[in-house]
Regions:
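Sec-dependent N-terminal signal peptides
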Residues: 4-14
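Surface-exposed polar/charged interaction patches
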Residues: 75, 89-96, 109, 127, ...
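Short E/K-rich amphipathic alpha-helical oligomerization segments
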Residues: 137-165
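Short, charge-rich amphipathic alpha-helices with coiled-coil/heptad character
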Residues: 90-119
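N-terminal Sec/ER secretory leader and immediately downstream segment
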Residues: 20-96
Length: 203
């Protein structure tokens, strides 16, 4: 039983150490995902069209582009619906400047979502780390109190009950981690799909 609990407590730390940050980057101990932690996206790894400039950054003042970017990056928008909307826009706005501005809007929108999702994942990971530390401390205390079980049985029972629920919470959250960790990648993939369509129509 102790071995099983030890493996459970080790899961959080093993995942962080095996899938460490690239050399030169400090690992965030609260990052709960096997995917490498990337603080923000780089447009150069997605977009090979015209360079994003102060001019393309003016998308924020363009109501049509602003609303289109929000709709295209909304998780509720199905990919086919999004690509159809994008192609309609391209038919009416084929200029390189317009498409670059739209990509800039999509990129900035995605990056904002990316940062928010990552912050939530870090908070999730911190809760897991703190819970695992609580369990380890209770195990240590139970071990110490068990040296005089009869005198400490009430306290031991109390700690055993708390430990049970701590482990239950830890496991319940761990079962959610894979789907939560995939959420930022969903938006990155969607952005890549849209970028590919726009690049086909960019001179």
């Amino acid at each position: 039983m102790i071995k099983i609990i030890f493996l459970l407590l080790s899961f959080f730390y093993i995942s962080n150490n095996v899938f460490a940050q690239p050399p030169g980057k400090e690992r965030n101990i609260d990052w709960p995902c096997i995917q490498v932690y990337i603080e923000e996206l780089s447009w150069g790894s997605i977009w090979t069209g015209p360079v994003l400039t102060e001019n393309s950054a003016k998308w924020i003042d363009n109501k049509d582009i602003f609303s289109l970017a929000e709709k295209l990056m909304d998780r509720k928008t199905k990919e086919k619906e999004g690509t159809d909307e994008l192609k309609k826009y391209i038919k009416k706005n084929k200029s390189s400047d317009k498409l670059t501005m739209l990509f800039h809007a999509l990129f900035d929108t995605t990056n904002t979502i990316w940062k928010i999702r990552n912050e939530k994942l870090l908070n999730f990971g911190k809760r897991q780390r703190l819970t695992s530390e609580k369990i380890a401390l209770k195990l240590e205390k139970i071990k110490e109190l068990s040296k005089d079980f009869e005198s400490n049985k009430d306290e031991i029972q109390k700690l055993e009950n708390e430990k049970f629920w701590d482990i239950r919470r830890f496991e319940d959250r761990r079962n959610l981690s894979d789907s939560l960790c995939e959420q930022p990648r969903f938006y990155e993939k969607r952005l890549g799909t849209y970028a590919g369509i726009m690049l086909e129509n960019t001179n």
